[in-house]
Structure formats: C-alpha cells, structure tokens
UniProtKB/Swiss-Prot annotation:
Residues 396-416 have a biased composition (Acidic residues). One of its GO terms (molecular function) is manganese ion binding. Binds 2 manganese ions per subunit. The active site is at H85 (proton donor). Its EC number is 3.1.-.-. This is DNA double-strand break repair protein Mre11. Its cofactor is Mn(2+). The lineage of its organism: Archaea, Methanobacteriati, Methanobacteriota, Methanomada group, Methanopyri. Mn(2+) 1 binds at D8, H10, D49, H200. It holds the Pfam family Metallophos. Mn(2+) 2 binds at D49, N84, H168, H198. Belongs to the MRE11/RAD32 family. Nuclease activity is regulated by Rad50.
Length: 451
C-alpha cells in the first residue's frame, strides 16, 4: 500500500499580510494535491498545521474541503492530527480538523482522557492491515511530563502489519529553538514509520528508536529563512511517498512539488551593490536584501530593489565595524538609546506591519536587557524580539496565561522517571520536578490540548 505524508501547509498564511503570499500558499497546495493524486496513494497523512489559524479564513477552508473531497472521491483515506496552529485555545472551541472530520473528509486522531480511543485508527489497504496512532501538538513541557502515558497509550498494535505514528513535534537538530525540542527517548517505541510535522524544512535523516521519522516541511516557504539552504540553493519542497507491505516499511522517497519562487533572498556587497541588485531581482518578487558593507541606507537599498521590479523589499544591513586607529579619540560615550531607537525605526519599516507597542516601551526594554548583560545577569527575553517585529505573543506565553480546562477526573499515572535522555534534554532536576507535579490531583488534563 502507498501513503502520502504531508505537513505544515499553513493555508491562510500571508507573510507581511500580503495577499499574494496567501495566494501562493494556496496555489502550491493545489499543486501538491495534484501530485498526491497522480501517485495513486491509498492514504494521505497530514501531520499537523494544514491551516494557519485555529479559525481559518473562509477561502482556506473552502480550498481544503474542495481538494480533500477530490481525494475522497478517488477512494483515498485521509488521516490527520492537529498542529500548534490548529489547537483550540478555549473550552468549547472546535479545531478545523474536527470540522473536516464532521464533513466526512478526514479521520481526526488525538489523545483525550475522556475519549481514549480517539488516537487510533485501523484500516486495511490491499491486504495490508495498518494502524495509525496520532497525537496533537503538545508544548515540550506537556509532552515530557506525560511521556510515560504517551509511551503506554501509543504502543504499536500487535495485530497490525504496519504501525504509523503521527506527531507534530520537533526532534533534536531540526530547529534552533531548544524550548521546542523533544528527545526521541520520550516517544513510543516500535512503530514502522513516524510521520512528523512542525519543522518547515524537509528532512529525511531523523530517526526515532531506529525507525524513520522524516519531516516533509512546508510545501511553500513561509518566511525568508526557509527559502535557501546554507549553500544558497533553493530548498526542496514537497511530500514523502511511503510504501508498505505486510512485512512493514518497504521504502520512502521525497516527491518534489513546484513552489511559487516568489520569495527571494539576495545578498549584495561592496561598491557595485546597486548593479548587482538590479541584475538579480525579478519582477514581482518579494525580496529580502542582505547588504554587506555597501555604505547605503535601508531606504536607498529598498528604492533600488523596487525600481528593479520587486513587489516588496525588506533590507538587512551588515556593516563591518571600523577599527579605531591608535591615537583616535572618541567624542564621548556611545548614545545607546539613540542607536536602539534608530534600530527600532528600521525594524518597523522592514516588517511592513502595524505595531501598537510604543517605541519608548521597546527602547526601555532593550536598555534593560543591555544593563542585565553588562551585569552578567541577563533577564528573560520573553517576546522582546516579537515586539519589535510586530508579532503576537508566543504560544508559550499564551499558554501560561490561559486557564486549563478541567480534568475529567480520570487518574492516569504520568510519572516519567523511567524515561532516560541525554544531558542536552531536560535536566534531572527538571525531571524530578515534573514527577512531583504529576502526582497531584489538580494536574491539567491532556484534553486541554485536543486539536
């Protein structure tokens, strides 16, 4: 039997609030679905974040219904779990994945202490019995604290020929944010294939307990950081085509899908930067220009890019520090506040978004950080970077301020002391704290995170 593994489509995403970016994401999704249909798969697995928002835009929902309906008409089974963008944030809210299930389009898998069998679905394809086990996204701390129950509940089905586990979590080495990384030791063992989501760049190198745990990535790059690899080449985009037989996994390969190429990162440097920029910008592109040692202002660089045909332009200046020659004297102390204020001004111009936080607040926070660094006691940065960029508060901060949903009263042993990880994961001190919290009757229920 054949399975398509996709993730992180983010229908409804619009970089810098540009309609063209929203359309690019949808158009690439249409091409992705056409490729999936051409591969004649038996099942499509969506490993989270089909949508950008828990309450998706009408056009995004309509397109998903249209394309998934076409697959269902072809006889394709669709199995999905919710990513962090689709998790309900208040009691009584409904995930868009649940809406698709109610329409008969997908099998929505998630773990709930009230409905313990919702995480598993078994079907037979061409004589191959397959059991899918799906878990909605959990913040790292929630995943680690519940590791033992997850490992117990998500054991492979011994009666199945193939077991596929679906997770929306980040493994070590996939993203730089350590607060999101979950070590493989916390995941259940024994599955033939781990269909992963949450990481936007494709990767097939990851393993969980010796089995493949690949990430298909986002079909359309969502940020400038996702456009090119370290060699400057465009990153591949697409999905994984996986083949199983009654003996388990046969093979899996990455199927490329053409994306818009609308986003571009252009690096220019030196005195001839203007000529180089005009040559490399294509009409209609949304460009991030990294200008190294040009001596130009952001406004000058942006003007040239727009004249060359760019639709929008974000500028990043990189200037080498000029060394002070022996005998030179400075005219006084650095005006840190002035430097920061100018940086905030440029950051706001570069993001092209409206920000309600006053400049004075951002400057004061930045000065406080610098004072802490100087005292060798840096404060918690929190959402400072997001404030400057005009981003909403992080999910972590939203989670901490949210009242957890009430538990259904079912007692589940959630101690995690049997799970061993390397030192780069959660510390032993942190593990013991987690263990002490989990025995209390007032623990938050996993139902809080139902997608």
């Amino acid at each position: 039997m054949r399975m398509a593994h996709v993730a992180d489509v983010h229908l409804g995403h619009a970089l810098m609030n540009l309609r063209s970016r929203e359309e690019a994401v949808m158009e690439t999704f249409e091409r992705l679905m056409e490729e999936v249909r051409e591969c004649s798969v038996d099942v499509l697995v969506i490993a989270g974040d089909l949508f950008e928002h828990a309450r998706p835009k009408t056009e995004a929902l309509y397109l998903a219904v249209e394309k998934l309906s076409e697959l269902k008409e072809d006889g394709v089974e669709i199995v999905a779990t919710a990513g962090n963008h689709e998790i309900r944030r208040r009691k009584g809210a409904v995930s868009p994945i649940s809406v698709l299930e109610r329409m008969g389009l997908v099998r929505h898998l998630y773990y709930s202490e009230r409905r313990p069998e919702r995480h598993r679905y078994t079907a037979t394809f061409d004589g191959v019995r397959v059991t899918f086990h799906g878990l909605q996204y959990l913040p790292k701390n929630s995943f680690v604290e519940r590791a033992k129950v997850i490992r117990a509940k998500y054991r492979p089905d011994p009666e199945a020929d193939v077991n596929v586990a679906i997770f929306h979590q980040a493994l070590p080495g996939t993203i730089p944010d350590e607060s999101e990384i979950v070590e493989p030791a916390y995941f259940p063992e024994g599955h033939d294939y781990y269909a992963m989501g949450h990481v936007h760049v494709p990767s097939r190198e990851e393993k969980i307990h010796g089995s493949p745990a690949p990430y298909p990535g986002s079909p359309e790059p969502l940020t400038f950081l996702e456009v090119k690899d370290e060699r400057g080449a465009h990153k591949r985009r697409g999905f994984f085509l996986v083949e199983f037989d009654r003996g388990g996994l046969v093979e899996y390969e990455f199927v490329e899908v053409e994306w818009s190429r609308e986003l571009s990162v252009v690096e220019v440097s030196g005195e001839r930067w203007e000529e180089e920029l005009r040559r490399r910008v294509r009409r209609g592109q949304i460009v991030k220009v990294v200008a190294k040692d040009t001596g130009a202002s952001p406004e000058e660089v942006e003007k040239v890019a727009i004249e060359a045909g760019a639709d929008r332009c974000v500028v990043e200046l990189r200037e080498r520090r000029r060394e002070v020659e022996e005998g030179d004297e400075t005219e006084g102390p650095l005006d840190l506040e002035g430097i920061i204020r100018e940086g905030v001004k440029r950051a706001r111009a570069a993001t092209l978004t409206r920000v309600d936080v006053p400049d004075d607040v951002v400057v004061e926070v930045a000065l406080e950080i610098l004072r802490g660094v100087r005292e060798d006691n840096p404060p918690d940065l929190g959402d400072v970077e997001g404030i400057v960029a005009g981003e909403p508060p992080s999910e972590g901060s939203e989670e901490s301020s949210e009242e957890p949903e009430e538990s259904d009263g079912e007692e589940v042993g959630l101690e995690v002391e049997e799970v061993k990880v390397e030192s780069r994961g959660t510390s032993s001190e942190g593990m013991s704290r987690a263990g002490s919290k989990l025995g209390s009757s007032g623990r938050p229920s996993l139902d809080r995170w139902i997608g």
